[in-house]
């Protein structure tokens, strides 16, 4: 494909226009009085959302150079979302401000490399000072962080706080759609482990990059599965019943994995494969725990069992299973509660008998996974559009509270960033000079952007609010339009969220400042209407030959005429 090249100021200007297009769409959502954004969908009703990363992912610009700028800011939002789960809008607003200031200085003749060094020194100092300002989570802080992260929704804050109380901050909390209008909390049997899908082609939800099945069956084995012939009997059986199947094995690879992927993508099977957790004997114990939780049987060579003879009676059953790139969460059915309690009692007896600290740690982990259960927040709303928006808010609140437990809390509303800017002023004036000093000042000026935008979204003059915040040394409460101690008022941010927003914004902005050339694909011209002899559908006559796909890959000899 032919390429388009853009150099120097032209390239940077195009990138900045793309950055602004995306950031201006996202920034209207920040703060408790942030606005909603309506997203057109190819099918069904439009979505109304208040979630920065969801909006960012939807934006695609006509100009190829501007689109690259938008994609770079999408990367900021996605990286912050992946690592912190929240703070995507803050990161986007910070990055936009830094890019604007940085490119303005480059155009005025500043050295891009020195600017970048200054920006990197600034963020290093900010991270140190942020850690000193951070306070440990205590009292009502989890409720407050969840409320702030969900846009001031008190019910969401209460629900997340209650869920963490019931299964602990390290426990498994999932969000699902309710069949009623009410949002409810339920604690049920379940567990999570740190293994994800064997192939991204198993994903069922492209937006969230997860594979999720309701009322699925589990095939548990400590064997490596390479040949599809091992799976033929059980797959044939499930193809008839239509039940989803998740295979948890030492490894699913080669022909077996390829066949599962093809048949899943063609809609022949609802299936996914996951690597079993842990290693060696601990893997066998982990599989046995999952078997007890789900009422299944581990297909093990130690017990002279083979995959070819597996029946549906050997499979575990779950209410729901959610598989991401790195983690799997099982929500079990309640029928196996007695067996789970007996299994926990057995592990506790092992715990009493061992002298090894390492073994005790691993046994305690198993007890926590089995006995802790899963808190399920069932989200209800009058319409599907509101339901999706509410679900996104609850997921943000959950992620923010987990981040708060990890690294603590700081004052919210952009107040902490504004306070940190004072330290950068000293760094710039006392330790640096030239363009490195300018780089520090770029970051310093950008730190007021989130608080300014929160004020604008609340209908106030952003510059006036920033000036008053600095004069009074207080934060701006956008809900009541008053100036107060936001930490004391319970308007909090997770330290980890603020830290990652800063680091990701500086990372992208400093790279854009040092850009001198942009290379983009040249858009292909649209095909002329009626090309092909006047009949635009004329070339499709040859598709009649697809009637021969009944055999789907030639596996009829294995008793699977309908599969690949």
Swiss-Prot record:
Catalyses:
ATP + H2O + a folded polypeptide = ADP + phosphate + an unfolded polypeptide
Gly residues compositional bias, start-end: 530-541
Q: Which PROSITE patterns match?
A: CHAPERONINS_CPN60
A molecular function (GO) held by this record is: isomerase activity
Q: Where in the cell is it found?
A: Cytoplasm
Pfam families per UniProt: Cpn60_TCP1
Which EC number(s) does UniProt give?
5.6.1.7
Q: Which domain of life is it from?
A: Bacteria
Going by the UniProt record, its keywords in alphabetical order are: ATP-binding, Chaperone, Cytoplasm, Isomerase, Nucleotide-binding
* Positions of the UniProt region annotated as Disordered: 521-541
**Principal place of residence:** cytoplasm
InterPro entries recorded: Chaperonin_Cpn60_CS (IPR018370), Cpn60/GroEL (IPR001844), Cpn60/GroEL/TCP-1 (IPR002423), GroEL-like_apical_dom_sf (IPR027409), GROEL-like_equatorial_sf (IPR027413), TCP-1-like_intermed_sf (IPR027410)
Q: Name one GO cellular component term.
A: cytoplasm
Q: Which SUPFAM superfamilies match?
A: GroEL apical domain-like, GroEL equatorial domain-like, GroEL-intermediate domain like
- Residues that hold ATP according to the record: 29-32, 86-90, 413, 493
Q: What's the family?
A: Belongs to the chaperonin (HSP60) family.
Q: Which PANTHER family match?
A: 60 KDA HEAT SHOCK PROTEIN, MITOCHONDRIAL
Q: How does it assemble?
A: Forms a cylinder of 14 subunits composed of two heptameric rings stacked back-to-back. Interacts with the co-chaperonin GroES.
Function of the protein: Together with its co-chaperonin GroES, plays an essential role in assisting protein folding. The GroEL-GroES system forms a nano-cage that allows encapsulation of the non-native substrate proteins and provides a physical environment optimized to promote and accelerate protein folding.
Q: What is the protein named?
A: Chaperonin GroEL 2
């Amino acid at each position: 494909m032919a390429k388009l090249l853009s150099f120097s100021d032209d390239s940077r200007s195009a990138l900045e226009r793309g950055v602004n297009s995306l950031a201006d769409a996202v920034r209207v959502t920040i703060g408790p009085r942030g606005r909603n954004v309506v997203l057109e969908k190819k099918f069904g009703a439009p979505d109304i959302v208040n979630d920065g990363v969801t909006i960012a992912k939807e934006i695609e610009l006509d100009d190829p150079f501007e689109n690259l700028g938008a994609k770079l800011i999408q990367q900021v939002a996605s990286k912050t979302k992946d690592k912190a789960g929240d703070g995507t809008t803050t990161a986007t607003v910070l990055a936009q401000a830094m890019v604007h200031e940085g490119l303005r200085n480059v155009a005025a003749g500043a050295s891009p490399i020195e600017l970048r060094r200054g920006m990197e020194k600034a963020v290093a100092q900010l991270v140190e000072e942020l850690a000193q300002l951070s306070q440990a989570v205590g009292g009502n802080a989890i409720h407050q962080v969840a409320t702030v992260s969900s846009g001031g929704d008190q019910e969401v804050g209460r629900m997340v706080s209650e869920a963490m109380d019931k299964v602990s901050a390290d426990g498994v909390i999932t969000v699902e759609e309710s069949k009623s209008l009410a949002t409810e909390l339920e604690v049920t049997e379940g567990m999570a482990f740190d293994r994800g899908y064997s192939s991204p082609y198993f994903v069922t939800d492209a937006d969230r990059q997860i594979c999720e099945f309701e009322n699925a069956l589990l095939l548990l084995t400590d064997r490596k599965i390479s040949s599809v012939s091992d799976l033929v009997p059980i797959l044939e059986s499930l193809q008839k019943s239509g039940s989803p199947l998740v295979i948890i094995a030492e490894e699913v690879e080669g022909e077996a994995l390829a066949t599962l992927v093809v048949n899943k993508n063609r809609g022949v099977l609802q299936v996914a494969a996951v690597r079993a957790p842990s290693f060696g004997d601990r893997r066998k114990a982990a599989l046995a725990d999952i078997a007890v939780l789900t009422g299944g049987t581990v297909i093990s060579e130690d017990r002279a069992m083979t995959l070819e003879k597996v029946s549906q009676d050997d499979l575990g059953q779950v209410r729901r299973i959610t598989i991401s790139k790195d983690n799997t969460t099982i929500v079990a059915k309640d029928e196996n509660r007695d067996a789970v309690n007996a299994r926990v009692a057995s592990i506790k007896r092992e715990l009493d008998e061992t002298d090894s600290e390492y073994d005790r740690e691993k046994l305690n982990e198993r007890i926590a996974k089995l006995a802790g259960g899963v808190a399920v927040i069932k989200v209800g709303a009058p319409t599907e559009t509101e339901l999706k928006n509410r679900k996104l808010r609850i997921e943000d609140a959950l992620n923010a509270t987990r981040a708060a437990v990890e690294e603590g809390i700081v004052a919210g509303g952009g107040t902490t960033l504004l306070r940190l800017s004072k330290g950068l002023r000293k760094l710039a004036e006392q330790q640096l000079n030239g363009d490195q000093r300018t780089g520090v000042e770029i970051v310093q000026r950008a730190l007021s952007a989130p608080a300014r935008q929160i004020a604008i979204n609340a209908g106030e003059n952003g510059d006036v609010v920033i000036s008053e915040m600095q004069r009074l040394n207080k934060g701006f409460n956008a809900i009541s339009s008053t100036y107060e101690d936001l930490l004391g008022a319970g308007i909090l941010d997770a330290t980890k969220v603020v830290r990652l927003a800063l680091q990701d914004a500086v990372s992208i902005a400093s790279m854009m400042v040092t850009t001198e050339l942009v290379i983009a694909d040249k858009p292909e011209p649209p095909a002329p209407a009626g090309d092909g002899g006047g009949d635009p559908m004329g070339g499709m006559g040859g598709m009649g030959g697809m009637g021969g796909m009944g055999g789907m890959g030639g596996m009829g000899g294995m008793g699977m005429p309908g599969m690949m």
